[in-house]
Curated annotation (Swiss-Prot):
Protein name in UniProt: RNase E specificity factor CsrD
The entry's keywords: Cell membrane, Coiled coil, Membrane, Transmembrane, Transmembrane helix
Disruption of the gene: reported phenotype: Dramatically stabilizes CsrB and CsrC RNAs, small RNAs that sequester the global carbon storage regulator CsrA; also decreased transcription of CsrB/C. Decreased biofilm formation, decreased expression of DgcC, a probable diguanylate cyclase and of the curli regulator CsgD. Decreased expression of the curlin subunit CsgB, decreased curli expression at 28 degrees Celsius.
Organism of provenance: Escherichia coli (strain K12)
Molecular function in Gene Ontology: cyclic-guanylate-specific phosphodiesterase activity; identical protein binding
Coiled coil, from the record: 194-224
Name of the encoding gene: csrD
Region described as HAMP-like: 152-219
Length: 646
């Protein structure tokens, strides 16, 4: 109950009690005064009768006694000698208004002039019909009504006076609930005004500190993964991501393409053409490459060395790489002519296919060799290191057929991988999906870009959530996490379906569901995600953000969204004990989550040294082959192990 409501109720109660006690006291005083006055009148009649009985008999005095009885509303007079009735006189009934009732009182008066005798007088109660008359009760009713109206107006006035304090209290509640930013700044109507201004000042300082912390986190990320000059990913980050893919922790046979893109040596050109012109041309080509690679989901572009750029294309084939190289050369051909560069001999591309199990240095050496071969061919061209490798890719038609068959058959194969706390207790199990194409299994990292490309993400996510809910009944002790695409989650139709589906589940089941979202998509669609995340949180479902650290995004979303888990990308965890920049980045993410309910978990943990380093940097839990590898989901298992060695 709010302060204004409490205070108004308290004042109303006190005023009401005061009025009630006053009315009760006045009524009792009025009643007693009337009764006292009337009893004295009746006693005066008894005294007059006693005086007349000295000289006359009772029967002779009947007319006089009757007149006295009428003046005092006495209805019967009994003359008693001790307890024996000597005489009695009753007055005939007089006119009474319709609806009136007779209430009688009795009074015995000893006769002073006739010792041993007494008069018993029965008279009408003067208050018996008082409240039956509108004229007599109208002033009292009007007074009570006036008091009630004044009390109502006083409470209204009091509420208006305290409305500013109520606004301040409401804003304080919103702040305690975690709201920040310009939405919780005060207004001129809040009271006390100095308290409101002080609160606004503190909020602005907190907002500035948060922005500075976010800029610092972004700076740390850029230091760990960004090239200073171009803003692209640097060589260290590129090699780290390639090594993570080559390790293939899920053992699904990852593959892809590395493209080495060599531009002219701009350091030599600056001696001839000047630094400013060369820099302008360099950034023109860099922007062209960056914009071009954005067309391909999952592609990673990095400045590898001086004028050499490297592009990592996971799950792509040589045929697709040749098409990409041809389109890139056509894009370069559209640049305007200039005297500095020969547009027909400006770019050389080396293409190298890689498979899981290879070495990073080996793959990059092959790409370098292919780039040199492209340069020897002359003109804008590309070269492939070894085109004898069997193709593992699929065309769009085959991909669509495979995905539609998977959806029609009930969804992909499910695997589970536990995430454990520092103590070794299982926090949740992540459900990981794979498709069997007839020969081998395909991981979700490979087929999900095609699901998004074909516009089947909403159908796919509905199927996955529908499969997740029955599993909660099989394992009532397990928290289950599943990845959901942000593209589906921001659609109103999917939001309505998700709300209706979750409301059909028991609350205890909803609390064990964790929805995982990619950090890059969260940072891009944060404003559209806020309402739906509030919805799922209100239903008891928890939210996690994975692939943290993969892309250069601000960490401001951590304060704006109620997220339970932040999962680090495996590339950030790999050999972290040897990479101080990655340790600094992890520590900054942990500090960004301080003051919130968000916990940081690491994924792809392979060794004890990595795990110990992560614990030292404040990570709450981990997931990876160091604890347990992915296992097929088996509904025949009644209970999974709840503890793993750490």
């Amino acid at each position: 109950m709010r302060l204004t409501t409490k205070f108004s109720a308290f004042v109303t109660l006190l005023t009401g009690l005061t009025i009630f006690v006053t009315l009760l006291g006045c009524s009792l005083s009025f009643y007693n005064a009337i009764q006292y006055k009337f009893s004295h009148r009746v006693q005066a009649v008894a005294t007059a009768i006693d005086t007349h009985l000295v000289s006359n008999d009772f029967s002779v005095l009947r007319p006089q006694i009757t007149e006295l009885m009428m003046s005092a509303d006495i209805v019967r007079v009994d003359l008693l000698h001790g307890d024996k009735q000597v005489y009695t006189l009753a007055r005939n009934g007089s006119y009474r208004p319709v609806g009136s009732s007779d209430l009688f009182r009795e009074l015995s008066v000893p006769l002073i002039k006739h010792p041993g005798m007494s008069l018993r007088l029965v008279y009408q109660d003067p208050m018996g019909n008082y409240f039956h008359s509108l004229m007599t009760t109208a002033p009292l009713t009007g007074a009570i009504g006036f008091i009630i109206v004044m009390l109502f107006l006083a409470v209204r006035w009091l509420q208006r006076q305290l409305a500013g304090q109520e606004l301040l209290e409401t804003r304080a509640t919103r702040i305690l609930n975690g709201e920040r930013g310009s939405n919780v700044l005060g207004t001129i109507y809040e009271w006390p005004p100095r308290t409101s201004s002080a609160l606004d000042t503190l909020l602005r300082e907190i907002q500035n500190a948060r922005e500075q912390h976010s800029r610092l986190d972004t700076l740390i990320r850029s230091y760990a993964a960004q090239d200073v000059k171009t803003g692209l990913n640097n060589r260290l980050f590129f090699d780290n991501q390639l090594a993570t893919l080559l390790e293939d922790q899920e053992k699904v046979g990852t593959h892809g393409i590395v493209m080495m893109i060599r531009l002219p040596d701009f350091n030599m050109l600056s001696d001839t053409w000047g630094h400013s012109q060369v820099e302008e041309q360099f950034f023109t080509l860099t922007n062209l490459l960056s914009t071009f690679m954005m067309r391909y989901p999952g592609a990673l572009l990095a400045r590898y060395h001086r004028s050499d750029f490297a592009a990592l294309l996971p799950h792509r084939t040589l045929k697709e790489a040749e098409s990409i190289a041809g389109q890139l050369i056509k894009a370069v051909d559209t640049l305007p002519n200039n005297k500095m560069l020969d547009r027909d001999d400006m770019i050389h591309i080396g293409i190298c296919a890689w498979r899981s199990g290879q070495d990073t240095e080996q793959v990059m050496e092959h790409a370098e060799s292919a780039t040199r071969n492209a340069g020897l061919q002359g003109g804008n061209s590309w070269a492939i290191y070894d085109d004898s490798l069997p193709e593992k890719g699929r065309g769009n038609v085959r991909w669509r057929t495979l995905i539609e068959q998977m959806l029609s058959r009930g969804g992909p194969r499910l695997y589970q991988k536990p995430a454990v706390t520092r103590e070794g207790q299982v926090h949740h199990r992540e459900l990981m999906c794979r498709i069997f194409d007839g020969n081998e299994e395909v991981s979700s990292a490979e087929y999900m870009p095609m699901v998004l490309q074909f516009g089947l993400s909403e159908e796919y996510d509905r199927l996955q959530i529908s499969r997740l809910i029955p599993l909660l009944r099989y394992w009532p002790e397990e928290n289950l996490a599943i990845q959901v695409t942000v593209e589906s989650l921001i659609r109103p139709r999917f939001q309505r379906w998700l709300r209706d589906t979750l409301m059909q589940c028991e609350k205890s089941q909803r609390k064990r569901i964790i929805i995982e979202l990619a950090e890059a998509d969260v940072g891009q669609h944060i404003s559209r995600l806020q309402p739906v995340i509030r919805l799922v949180n209100a239903l008891g479902v928890r939210v996690a953000v994975n692939q943290a650290g993969l892309t250069l995004v601000s960490t401001s979303w951590i304060k704006e969204l109620n997220v339970e888990l932040l999962k680090l990308h495996p590339g950030l965890v790999r050999n972290i004990e040897k990479r101080t920049e990655n340790q600094l980045l992890v520590q900054s993410l942990v500090e960004a989550c301080s003051g919130t309910s968000t916990q940081v978990y690491a994924t792809g943990v392979r060794s004890r040294s990595e795990w110990q380093t992560l614990i030292q940097r404040g990570v709450t839990g981990g997931q990876g082959d160091f604890f347990a590898s992915s296992q097929p989901l088996d509904t025949n298992v009644k209970k999974y192990s709840q503890r793993y060695s750490v």
